[in-house]
C-alpha cells in the first residue's frame, strides 16, 4: 500500500487476558473484563496489540495492518470476519470489517475495525 493508515481511529482498552493470548491475536470476551482466543470462526471484539503480566491491550476500533488470515473470501471491501485461534477468516457470523489491503503472499490483511 502506498499510503499509511497507521493511527487512524485507534481505540485501545486494557483487559485481563487468558494465557493463550498473544500480540496480534483476534480476541473475544470470555468473562467479566477478560479476553481469550476465538474458536471456529467466532466474531472477535478486537485485536491484542500488547500482552503483559496477564493483561492485554485490545484494539477495539481503528486501522490494524498485519492481521493474519486463512482460507478464501478475504478481499478488499467490507467482509464479515471471524477468527479461529490467531487467524481471521471470512465468516457469515463474523464482524463486519473494512479490508483495505490484502497480502496474499504473507496471508495478512489490513483492516479497519
Report each predicted region and the residues it spans.
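Surface-exposed, low-hydrophobicity beta-strand/loop segments enriched in small/polar/acidic residues
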Residues: 1-113
